């Protein structure tokens, strides 16, 4: 158990799932008039199902408020942890990308300082970071391209984005 709490990916995944569940619960209580327990149950199940890309559904989230649907699409986009069979970009890549951007911003603010990106105490080589950035860019561009093509074909924007992200994942 202690090793898990030192793992950057696990902590980020836990924060992501907790925040998404809390935000969707709040949004369902506010926008759909669900009770607190009912909203939490639907939100927690859908967040777990979508982030692991298992595809199970406990409620028709197509009728949920747009904010909840947007969070669900974001969870589809991110996906699960490294080594899992879930789709998406993976949490590890998001953590590395975030740390890379943070490091670049920090270096711009303090040019004399050398900022290294570390993951679980290990310094990440520059070629790994650039490979993650390239993968992220290509993934985003393909999602945007597929969504754009579907929008041109008359599919509503949010539906096109959802289909594009779920197909890519």
Residue ranges and their predicted role:
Residues 1-169:
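Membrane-proximal intracellular helices of multi-pass ion channels
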């Amino acid at each position: 158990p202690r090793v898990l709490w030192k793992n950057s990916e696990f902590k980020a995944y836990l924060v992501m799932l907790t925040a998404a569940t809390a935000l969707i619960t709040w949004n369902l209580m506010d926008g759909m008039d669900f009770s607190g327990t009912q909203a939490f149950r639907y939100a927690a199940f859908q967040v777990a199902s979508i982030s692991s890309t298992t595809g199970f559904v406990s409620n028709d989230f197509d009728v949920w408020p747009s904010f909840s649907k947007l969070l669900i699409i974001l969870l589809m986009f991110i996906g699960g942890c490294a080594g899992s069979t879930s789709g998406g970009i993976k949490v590890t890549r998001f953590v590395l990308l975030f740390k890379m951007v943070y490091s670049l911003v920090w270096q711009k603010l303090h040019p004399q300082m050398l900022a290294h990106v570390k993951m679980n105490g290990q310094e990440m080589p520059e070629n790994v970071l650039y490979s993650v950035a390239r993968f992220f860019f290509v993934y985003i561009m393909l999602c945007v391209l597929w969504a754009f093509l579907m929008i041109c074909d008359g599919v509503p924007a949010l539906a096109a984005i959802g289909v594009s992200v779920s197909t890519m994942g």
